[in-house]
Amino acid sequence: MSMKKLLENFNKHLSESSLSRTHQHLMEHDCAIITGYRGDPTDSSKCVADRRKDVGNDALKINKERNAELISNLRSLGYGVTSVAGSYVEDFMQDTAKEVKEASLFVANLNDDPSFLAQIENLGQYFCQDSVLLIPQGGQGAYLLGTNNSEFPGLGQKIDVGSFAGGEEAEFMTRVKGRPFVFKEK
């Protein structure tokens, strides 16, 4: 077997085991998907929380700094954090809607902290996210929770997105090590 083929097989196995590990976390703990990224990280017009003002004209650099700060906050709370690739429509159903691909974070409540969902909601507000994806233990009944003043889903509003479906692609999806997963109605 060539080295290239060996590496391809290893990477495929790594991708599958990473998706399996994600599924295992979903079965055993409450989980969430969140990011510090914003389409325009300097625009705080829809924010509800007091947060340091992001300044500058390099959005990618600002977003990377925001995600690093978010990772630090999540780890300090004792949560498991895995980098994933997210894809969704920011400002959904508005004139300013646009597809955004961003570095997102899959967060597992490894210590079953009873304040996990509230902590994720607070971090969503702090980082001025339109919403966070909250996933109850078992991977069923996941929902978006609005965490800023965007029209969709709206501050404090819940939008049911369904249950975990590994290996499937959709308009709104997440990838871990290149393997997609979605939440959808069954």
Positions of the model-derived regions?
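N-terminal, charge-rich interaction modules
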Residues: K5-S83, S87, V182-K186
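Active-site-proximal loop/helix of nucleotide/amide-processing enzymes and allied scaffolds
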Residues: S20, I33-I34, P114-L117, E151
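Short, surface-exposed beta-edge/turn micro-motifs
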Residues: E28-C31, K101-L105, C128-S131
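Short, intrinsically disordered low-complexity segments
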Residues: E69-N111
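A generic structural motif
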Residues: T82-G86, S131-G138
